[in-house]
Structure formats: structure tokens, C-alpha cells
């Protein structure tokens, strides 16, 4: 029998008593709150559905870690803040993570190692990625039951810096870096992701947007035939093919325009009026107007909203093109400006979920990683939805992780039960209990 000697650690003294620590406290985890994610996943089947999208060419008799376990391990790890496969080296025996992935914390085998997870990510095929795209939309429909009056689609692109010789990594002049150029589509009201597409680094912001939106609109109409659909986007998506698509599909849109001399000329009178009012009052002026406009690349005239501000620093003008018949200021302030929330969702994905940690050499493997990070975000989104009416109803996912998932606990296994002894000093016990109660009561 092997005997393990644990070295005692000394931390000085306190009121004449020696402060001593050692590492023989038992199977203790710092992520016991992750069991909330296990409950959510059990109700919505996010990881199980994602596993069904994948192909497994391995011989069954040689498989130790099946696809369902591998994808649970990756998605739950990302949600807990362990985005790198390298983290599996130290976390594969963590009792909470093992429990979350349907393994017994003590008697079951440890989870997959970093090399196994790396092979898992690099095996993905184009067909599997298409199925994952479909599954992400199905999860959206499951979490947004109808009927619905209005659906707002927000589309935006972001940069993902690359390193070394990664496939389809290119220099982008606007961002001035070698990068990938992911495309994200969110529900503009709830903030739930509908699509995430990884693209080469040298693509335009609107690249592939028409094809993705056309398919998405078709599926939205089928799922919510009663709903009015509105598309919002910034000037990176100011391309005629998107206007035409929306008009053909009966979709409302409001899309930013890049300011040019012709637009300035059309709004010159409004600018002069704003300047005059500012000089008279000394207070910031904010005026709106609308007019018909046709760029050289457009097949027809379209309605353009002009916003003109005048202040101490001078003029600030913005233009949007739309087919919505609302008063200019109401359309701009109540519809278009709210598009900015999508940028906050992308920030959450990048800063809290580390969705820009796409470090594989293979491009398809990085697209797969983007889906894994997005599904992890979906779980945390669902957790936040089950906290409506509490202090965490509008919390960032990083705050949810710190307050509800990072809980110290001792986990032990008996012949009949798995016992999870949460830290007595955990300060959010009532909130955690309420979250679990809401999750268990949530409709599926």
C-alpha cells in the first residue's frame, strides 16, 4: 500500500496559535456551483443535442470517453472559466466536473486529457458543423417559445487575432492585424445567439451575411409565422444585397450608412438649423429628418434617416437606411440605437467566455471551438434567465460565474449517494437555492 505524505504549510500564528495547512482535506472542488449548469443542460439537452451532431470514427471497443462526455467536458469547462484544452490536464479528476459530465466523482475514470480533447476538436467535419448550426437555432427556438409579436435580428462582426500559421488567417486592414473575422447573429431583444460563423481574416464585414440571413429568415418564419421580423445592423452591412433580401422576404430593416458627401448635401439644411439653434442657446442640439436617397449601386430609391447633432466640439451626423414607416427620431432612438446591446453580448463572449481563444491550426476545428464557446454562453444565458427578479437578473456572465458557480465544496461518494457539502460560509446561499428552484420549475 502506498503512503502519501502531505507536507504541512505554515502561515505564522494568530493569537498565539500556529496557522497550519495541508492538502489532505479530501475531494474538494472550487466549482460546485457548476451543478446548476448540469441541471439546466438536463432540461434543455444542449450538450446531448450537440453530441448527436458529431460523427465518431473510432472503434467502439477502444473508446473510453464517448462523444457526449467529451462535449460535456469542453462546454462545462468553458462555462466555468477553463477555456483551454490544456486545463484538462489539471481538471480531469475534479469531482465537480466529473459529476457534471455524468461520472461518479471518486470511483469513475478521470475525464479526457488534453491530447484526447485536441484530437476530438480536430476530427470535426463540415457536415457536422452544419448540423451544429442547425442545433444552435433549435436551442434558440426551444428557449423562445411562441407565439411572438416581434423578432429583432442583430447582426455584427468582430475581430479574433490569430497567431502563427493558422489556416485562413489573413491581415485585415481595418483592424490592422492578422485575424479571423467571426460573424454573430443575436436575438436583439433577449440577447440569445442565433448563429456564429467563423470567416477568413480578410473578408468584408458583410461576407456571407446574405446566405446566412436568408436561411435564418426562412426558419424563423416557419417557427414563428405570426411574428414581425426586424433586422438591425451597422454600416458594415450597408450593402444593397441585404436591402433587397429583406424587401423580397417582407422583413423590416434599419441599417447604418457610411457618411458621404451626397448624404451630407441632402442634410445640409438640417445641419445649418442645428448650428443656428446651438449658437442661440449654447446647448447641444439634436435634430432628425428623413429623405429618399439612391446610391449609385442601388436599384431604387430608399428612405434614409438623418440624425444631426451640434455641440461644443462641432457637428456629429449619422445616417441609416430603412423600410420602416416611423418618425425619424423614434425609429433612430427606439429601434436602431438599441442595436448597441449586441456589442455587449459579443464582449461577453470574448471577455468572459473567451470565444476568441481559437488557437487550433485547422480552420474547421476553430469553427467547432466557436460553437463550443457559444453553447457555453447559452447555458449561462439560461442561468441568468432563471434569475429574473433578483440582483443578478442583468448580471454579466462573469459575475454569474463568480457568485453562483465558484463554490467550494467537499464531494464524497457512498454506495447510494453522491454527497456535495457546500461551504458553510458561502455568502449567496439563498440566491443559489432560488436559482436551483427556478431551474427545476422551468418549462422545457
Model-inferred region functions:
Residues 203-262:
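Domain-level cores of phosphate- or acyl-group-handling catalytic modules
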Amino acid at each position: 500500500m502506498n503512503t502519501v505524505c502531505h507536507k504541512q504549510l505554515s502561515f505564522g500564528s494568530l493569537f498565539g496559535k500556529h496557522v497550519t495547512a495541508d492538502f489532505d482535506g479530501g475531494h474538494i472542488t472550487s466549482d460546485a456551483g457548476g451543478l446548476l449548469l448540469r441541471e439546466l443542460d438536463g432540461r434543455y439537452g444542449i450538450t446531448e443535442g450537440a453530441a448527436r451532431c458529431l460523427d465518431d470514427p473510432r472503434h467502439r471497443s477502444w473508446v473510453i470517453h464517448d462523444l457526449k462526455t467529451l462535449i460535456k467536458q469542453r462546454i462545462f469547462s468553458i462555462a466555468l472559466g477553463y477555456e483551454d484544452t490544456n486545463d484538462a490536464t489539471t481538471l480531469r479528476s475534479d469531482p465537480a466536473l466529473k459529476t457534471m459530465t455524468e461520472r461518479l466523482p471518486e470511483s469513475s475514470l478521470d475525464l479526457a486529457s488534453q491530447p484526447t480533447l485536441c484530437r476530438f476538436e480536430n476530427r470535426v467535419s463540415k457536415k457536422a458543423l452544419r448540423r451544429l448550426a442547425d442545433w444552435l437555432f433549435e436551442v434558440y427556438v426551444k428557449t423562445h417559445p411562441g407565439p411572438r409579436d416581434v423578432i429583432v435580428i442583430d447582426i455584427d462582426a468582430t475581430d479574433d487575432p490569430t497567431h502563427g500559421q493558422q489556416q485562413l488567417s489573413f491581415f485585415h486592414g481595418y483592424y490592422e492585424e492578422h485575424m479571423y473575422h467571426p460573424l454573430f447573429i443575436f436575438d436583439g431583444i433577449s440577447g440569445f445567439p442565433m448563429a456564429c460563423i467563423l470567416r477568413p481574416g480578410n473578408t468584408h464585414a458583410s461576407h456571407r451575411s446574405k446566405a446566412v440571413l436568408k436561411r435564418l429568415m426562412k426558419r424563423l418564419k416557419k417557427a414563428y409565422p405570426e411574428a414581425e421580423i426586424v433586422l438591425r445592423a451597422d454600416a458594415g452591412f450597408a450593402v444593397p444585397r441585404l436591402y433587397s433580401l429583406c424587401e423580397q422576404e417582407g422583413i423590416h430593416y434599419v441599417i447604418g450608412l457610411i457618411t458621404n458627401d451626397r448624404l451630407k448635401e441632402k442634410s445640409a439644411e438640417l445641419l445649418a438649423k442645428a448650428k443656428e439653434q446651438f449658437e442661440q442657446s449654447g446647448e447641444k442640439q439634436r435634430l432628425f429628418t428623413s429623405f429618399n436617397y439612391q446610391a449609385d449601386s442601388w436599384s431604387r430609391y430608399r428612405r434614409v434617416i438623418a440624425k444631426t447633432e451640434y455641440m461644443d466640439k462641432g457637428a456629429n451626423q449619422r445616417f441609416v437606411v430603412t423600410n420602416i414607416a416611423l418618425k425619424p427620431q423614434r425609429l433612430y432612438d427606439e429601434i436602431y440605437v438599441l442595436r448597441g446591446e449586441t456589442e455587449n453580448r459579443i464582449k461577453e463572449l470574448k471577455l468572459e467566455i473567451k470565444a476568441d481563444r481559437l488557437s487550433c491550426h485547422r480552420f474547421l476545428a476553430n469553427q467547432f471551438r466557436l460553437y463550443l464557446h457559444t453553447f457555453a454562453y447559452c447555458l449561462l444565458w439560461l442561468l441568468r434567465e432563471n434569475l429574473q427578479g433578483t440582483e443578478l437578473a442583468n448580471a454579466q456572465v462573469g459575475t454569474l460565474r463568480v457568485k453562483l458557480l465558484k463554490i467550494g465544496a467537499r464531494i464524497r461518494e457512498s454506495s447510494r449517494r453522491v454527497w456535495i457539502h457546500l461551504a458553510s460560509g458561502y455568502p449567496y446561499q439563498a440566491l443559489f437555492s432560488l436559482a436551483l428552484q427556478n431551474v427545476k420549475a422551468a418549462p422545457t
